């Protein structure tokens, strides 16, 4: 018998054996695609397509324009369902990979079946190839059939297949790739174990181990690196997440949801992972002992590494749990030791199936305890120097600073952009704006503020980790301000809302003896743009008095203001409207672009020359709103432009505001 005929004969027998899997898949895909499409279409019609029409019901006018809109929204509904980025296939693909992978090689966990299959005059490689390929074909054919059924259903709703064929085929391709990566992982888990339940547990470990470890490390960094203003080691977290097929799948879908596209290197990485998984599975299958069936693990050499990794991860998790309960060193160490002991004993029971052998690997256990304790202490005492880190001045190209005394009075930067023929508003947080726009080159000022932050961070670590949080400790450290009847009220330095105000300083206490009366603490985010292209960030709580001189210099800098205030992003040639508001009322507004441009120029020039001393002496009483052409287009699209232009103007505006404008110009 030729290899080809033998392959197809074995394939036919295997498909008969797995007919229940095929039936289960058909049921799942039928409800996930054709039935789901019918439900989506009916819900859209019942809500008058409000979900696709800016949450505004689409009124049935019977006009060609209305019918065109309905068809557009129906097409969008179909595209959303079949495109890559829909999260529904995630559940389908992962579940199918586990069921198909486990069912295809379940015989390896039964000694009688192993003896039978391996007694056949068929090479192991041929058996592996048949069962492996069948697992991919079962899913791919079922998926494709139901996409064809969905195409027919969409056509019945009037949606042309040409409108969604491209996104549908690409979604099919990408989901199939992630299915195959997950499927290869399940097969490897089946090959490495001798019992089906252990194989399923191994599958869970392979799916979750690296993302969980990444999340735990991030959690430790979040707790013990008190100056972190972003994920301290995001590259490590992303790398660990992508080492799991499910984690990589979820991250890819999240990227699509965030507006990113699939890159060629992502597809190439998936193809490499699929090939590597298939080869690894084949090698394990060839070397797997026949007597491995019925044992927990098929390969003795893999037992220790897997046990050590799981035990350490368990210790990290329980250590973090107990730390969150008490925030004490002894409880963190207790959680680490207990977690390691429990995990070690549970795994030994799974491995050995004998309670007498719970501590049969004492040296490994002691090594894990020592490693876990050292891991915890390294974060608790910051052996990495994270909170003390300041780059060498020669390695810094530029820097950004965000101080709460300025940031607290800024709104998020809103700007309108056109997407798919429609205007939408994007919002940028203040910290993101500073991180991406500020380019400070005065390193003396930046490092002076950073060094003050490092000094205070050391004291904050001592307060946070060496003592209980309490009113006395908080008052000593300045972390908590307690209101008292004898408070001196609130001292306002600056005022109003907008970038011309400075801050509200709350000073509390009954007299000069109260340490809280003397100073306030502000938060400072520092971003170092290094010459090697990397960006490093830190966040400090800093005494305002300790950096006041540096802050005076900083605020006088043009680089600081242009990186802090979004108003400098406005271009004079793109303005559509300017509004002056005071005490909640509009005192002046104009659509005269020439006037708006002059107001913007005057405001920008005045803001650049402003100093901290000026702000201490002046109280802003109003705010200017600049509306550019893009935002005006968005307002008109949403039907708000007329409403904005017809806002009542304070009757006193004529005499007062023109004086202000003349003075500014």
Residue ranges and their predicted role:
Residues 364-372, 380-489, 500-665:
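Function-determining sites in protein domains
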Residues 307-317, 347-387:
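Internal/C-terminal transmembrane anchor helices
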